[in-house]
Amino acid sequence: KSGIMSKLRFRVVETAFKKKAVEVATPAERPSEYFGKYVFNKEKMFKYLPSKVYNALIDAIDNGAPLDRSIADEVAAGMKKWAIEMGATHYTHWFAPLTEGTAEKHDAFVEHDGKGGMMEEFTGKLLVQQEPDASSFPNGGIRNTFEARGYSAWDPSSPAFIVDDTLCIPTVFIAYTGEALDYKAPLLKALRAVDKAAVDVCHYFNPEVK
């Protein structure tokens, strides 16, 4: 068996050396012309969202302010309009489970309208939360195997982006009990803790620092 495994390892290395670099064509001469083209950044938010919604979303991104569900509906509408204009037909909650990779839950923008036709739909409810099957992901022993429910929740601090024909929405992945099942949720908690500690230190020099 050890001899077979050694041969397999050599074959893997040999195959890896045979791979050639993929040629990538530059979309334009100036990076500024295509940088962020497929990212729903603040520029796109300002263009596709009402001013009240834009300001609320920016407040959530910059200051961690909570978002009302009605705001989420309008964000979803603007995000869907931009994505469809860019050629997207599907959307996915994109997260980083404890497998040192990424995972996605794909859905199409189109839904049956109940009258024999189709309609494009993407609501705030679909943007904010999805329910992927968590049974196939590591959980660190925090739950029983049969407790397979997991939730992916939208993270407004990371901008949505398009890959091919899919709108990717960055999310955190948690168990139904609230424990983190991904790498991102602990990082966000750590960032908030560091931010709070830094502000406390800054108050020694300037009480108005927020």
Name every feature range the model reports, one short phrase each.
Residues 6-17, 21-27, 146-167:
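N-terminal hydrophobic targeting/anchoring segments and the immediately downstream early-domain regions
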Residues 6-19, 42, 61-73, 184-209:
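Short, charge-rich amphipathic segments
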Residues 1-4:
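Short, Lys/Arg-enriched N-terminal segments with co-localized hydrophobic residues
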Residues 17-124, 128-146:
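Histidine/acidic residue-rich metal-binding segments in metalloenzymes
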Residues 149-210:
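Glycine-rich, acidic/polar active-site loops that bind/position phosphate-bearing ligands
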